[in-house]
Amino acid sequence: MPELPEVEVVRRGLHSHVVGKTIGAVRVHHPRAVRRHEAGPADLTARLLGARITGTDRRGKYLWLLLDGRDTALVVHLGMSGQMLLGAVPRAEHVRISALLDDGTVLSFADQRTFGGWMLADLLEVDGSVVPEPVAHLARDPLDPRFDADAVVKVLRRKHSEIKRQLLDQQVVSGIGNIYADEALWRAKVHGARIADALTRKQLTAVLDAAADVMRDALAKGGTSFDSLYVNVNGESGYFDRSLDAYGREGESCRRCGAVMRREKFMNRSSFYCPKCQPRPRL
């Protein structure tokens, strides 16, 4: 699933190419792509017709397009395999929605697994920010200028469960998925099974700082692409997968100490870690 860096790469691409453009005809090619828009496909297409895009924004793994003179936004969730693509014509297999812009560009939403989609949602003011209603419950992410690491540390120190579980909880801190959780924990030298309330403030701060740092590094390299499911708006893959220190490196040498990296099951996922740098907690 695209995590914060990948979604931010897409948002930046959209901001550069669609802000100031007006939406013309919109076609929904697969109803699942608009299943979160409760009023249905016809309502979505009618309300988008003639809307001018004035900006883009993101929180965690959600992004949205701001529309001129409206108190609603077009919310996009990429799900497992969603792609926002720009071109003269719909340019990908699995195109679920296409929108013609006034300069002739087609904005396409492609989604092989159909877990993502578009919806129009009301904008709300929450904690000093204006966000779409489906995003209102999400915590700020580590790249948000108003992210308060000290406040998150206080929350984590009240959580009696694994630190990795907390990093994946979008109501504690948003935008972090399995890949960047493992990378942050490796950088901070903390095993994901450590209990959050047993970690010191210094350790928890180190984990959050590492999460922000690794996502900035990933963003600079276009995100992480293991296959063709994640690409930017031009259809190009990111290349941070070449720089991963933990995720996917079972059996390889730790880049820091040389120990053999391990993999274990966690929450129906795989966790990758160094047994020397990140010793597993004793039961």
Swiss-Prot record:
A zinc finger (FPG-type) spans 245-279. This is Formamidopyrimidine-DNA glycosylase. GO terms for molecular function: 8-oxo-7,8-dihydroguanine DNA N-glycosylase activity; class I DNA-(apurinic or apyrimidinic site) endonuclease activity; damaged DNA binding; zinc ion binding. It holds the Pfam family Fapy_DNA_glyco. HAMAP family: Fapy_DNA_glycosyl. Monomer. Binds 1 zinc ion per subunit. Its cofactor is Zn(2+). DNA binds at residues 94, 113, 159. GO terms for biological process: base-excision repair. PANTHER family: FORMAMIDOPYRIMIDINE-DNA GLYCOSYLASE (PTHR22993:SF9). The gene is mutM. Involved in base excision repair of DNA damaged by oxidation or by mutagenic agents. Acts as a DNA glycosylase that recognizes and removes damaged bases. Has a preference for oxidized purines, such as 7,8-dihydro-8-oxoguanine (8-oxoG). Has AP (apurinic/apyrimidinic) lyase activity and introduces nicks in the DNA strand. Cleaves the DNA backbone by beta-delta elimination to generate a single-strand break at the site of the removed base with both 3'- and 5'-phosphates.
